[in-house]
Amino acid sequence: MTCADHPAPDPDTPLLADSLRASGYAVDVQDWRDSSVDWSGARVTVLRSPWDYVDHLDEFLAWAARTSKQSELWNPLAIVRWNTHKSYLLDLAARGAPIVPTVVLLGGSAASLDRICDAQGWNAVVVKPAVASGGQGARRAGVGDPDAQGHLDELLARGDVLVQQFVPAVEDEGEWSVVLVDGQVGHALRKQPAPGDYRVQHEWGGRTELATPSTGLSELATRVFALLPAPALYARIDVVPIGGQWHVMELEATEPSLWLDLAPATTRLLVDAIGARLSPRTG
């Protein structure tokens, strides 16, 4: 399942769809907002790139609830509801996962960025919407930045907001991402920002390369995957180093880019995992 209303193509879906077809499965790629689609005709519905859900969250959650009654939804509804609002980070922390220090602010509330920084002991932060993807609406800010306070006020007028401690290592070392399938590490990626930026997404000039995760990183990713609120088909866990230890910055289990073109073995893992959910074979 994908979306039609997005300027950038999703390179993962064609690779996965072709690999499933080559393994003997019937595959249709559909836009979740297409009301003519009969989702009950699918034994399994795999969420891949519904990237426009951030602009239609209530509609998307209603679609997921309906579809989960008609088809086997992966990832399941409980994960979709949990993962589409970044407050899931606080839940992960409560379950024992190390996260980048985060404060969640409710939409419509009034908050002082300087007071938050003072209370937390932070010199710099990243302010971002609680419902967003691809770095949308994110802004780095330092203490005493009046423009950043205005940005926070604008975001709060629209909805809930995350304020996260800025991790300086991102500028030099970038982020690491670990892609897991059924709890098994498929591959890892190192994502680095463009010079002078902190955002690692390609929309902002970032670059991504396949990398070998350390044993500690793989173990952390596996442990965090097990903390999801329901069994999951896949997830991408984004981490950064703080004080020599990995901390979760985000966890994507609804619409993550997986860079399957860099990791054909992970594509095979996904095909096998989806196949295990399909009985008997179709097509």
What does each model-identified segment do?
Residues 64-69, 77-173, 215-218:
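Active-site nucleotide/adenylate-binding loops and adjacent lid/helix of ATP-dependent enzymes
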